[in-house]
Curated annotation (Swiss-Prot):
This is NAD(P)H-quinone oxidoreductase subunit K. [4Fe-4S] cluster binds at C63, C64, C128, C159. NDH-1 shuttles electrons from an unknown electron donor, via FMN and iron-sulfur (Fe-S) centers, to quinones in the respiratory and/or the photosynthetic chain. The immediate electron acceptor for the enzyme in this species is believed to be plastoquinone. Couples the redox reaction to proton translocation, and thus conserves the redox energy in a proton gradient. Cyanobacterial NDH-1 also plays a role in inorganic carbon-concentration. Its EC number is 7.1.1.-. It comes from the Bacteria. It is a peripheral membrane protein. It holds the Pfam family Oxidored_q6. Its cofactor is [4Fe-4S] cluster. One of its GO terms (molecular function) is 4 iron, 4 sulfur cluster binding. It is found in: Cellular thylakoid membrane. NDH-1 can be composed of about 15 different subunits; different subcomplexes with different compositions have been identified which probably have different functions. GO terms for biological process: aerobic respiration; electron transport coupled proton transport; photosynthesis, light reaction. Binds 1 [4Fe-4S] cluster.
């Protein structure tokens, strides 16, 4: 062997060997590595496989689930998107919250979401799921928005939304999955969580004084005028009182 040639063991110091054999830091995907051609191709293939086989969890608590059930039928045929309904959260990667979420159902929903494998996605379907809907004003048990419990990827407004709207939400979710990268996939950013909803405060309805209300003692002014009934003196304006006094 020529004296000018050195063995591979002489090229590395003992400290460098320790770093190679026993790395301290965890492996991370850097920006340079994420732009690698091979890794980018594998990432696109992985995203294509995921968006082509989204398995939703059968979860429904109210009338919105009827529209979701119609989506499974032959008329709309959502199997063409690769969606296979699952009854177990451990086999699903998508949950469509269809219906009102109550305080008693909230822990069960969070438990189902936590049992789903990552990455997992959530579609909020219907007004009751998004803001509480018609129960948001005086209900003491309805949750005002499912995004206060679990993060939401896509919202579907409506009461209830039609199956075509669910298709539109699934298409938007597929586009979102297609743009995911291996660098940010574990973080699952661009999601909505703990959104504060500003609702208009109104006077309470259930006050216990319903039978004593003025509308129970006499019909409303608009109804009296429409039916040609004599307007009670309490509902008359100043001009109407003057006309009655004049005869």
């Amino acid at each position: 062997m020529s004296p000018n040639l050195t063995s591979s063991s002489d090229l590395f110091t003992q400290e460098q060997k320790e770093k190679l054999l026993n790395p301290i830091n965890h492996s991370q995907v850097t920006q340079d590595l994420s732009e690698n051609v091979i890794l980018t191709t594998v990432d696109d293939l992985y995203n294509w496989a995921r968006l082509s086989s989204l398995w939703p969890l059968l979860y429904g608590t109210a009338c919105c689930f009827i529209e979701f059930a119609a989506l499974i039928g032959s008329r709309f045929d959502f199997d063409r998107f690769g969606l296979v309904p699952r009854s177990s959260p451990r086999q699903a990667d998508l949950i469509i919250t269809a219906g009102t979420i109550t305080m008693k159902m909230a822990p069960a929903l969070v438990r189902l979401y936590e049992q789903m494998p990552d990455p997992k996605y959530v579609i909020a379907m219907g007004a009751c799921t998004i803001t509480g809907g018609m129960f948001s004003s005086d209900s003491t048990t309805a949750v005002r928005g499912v995004d206060k419990l679990i993060p939401v990827d896509v919202y579907i407004p409506g009461c209830p939304p039609r199956p075509e709207a669910i298709f539109d939400a699934i298409v938007k979710l597929r586009k979102k999955v297609a743009n995911d990268s291996i660098q940010v996939r574990p973080e699952q950013n661009h999601r909505y969580y703990s959104t504060t909803h500003t609702m208009k405060a109104t006077s309470p309805i259930l006050t216990g004084q319903y039978l004593r209300a003025q509308t129970r003692q006499a019909p409303p002014l608009e109804l009296s005028e429409a039916m040609g009934m004599p307007i009670p003196p309490a509902l008359m304006t100043t001009e109407q009182k003057e006309e009655v006094d004049r005869g």
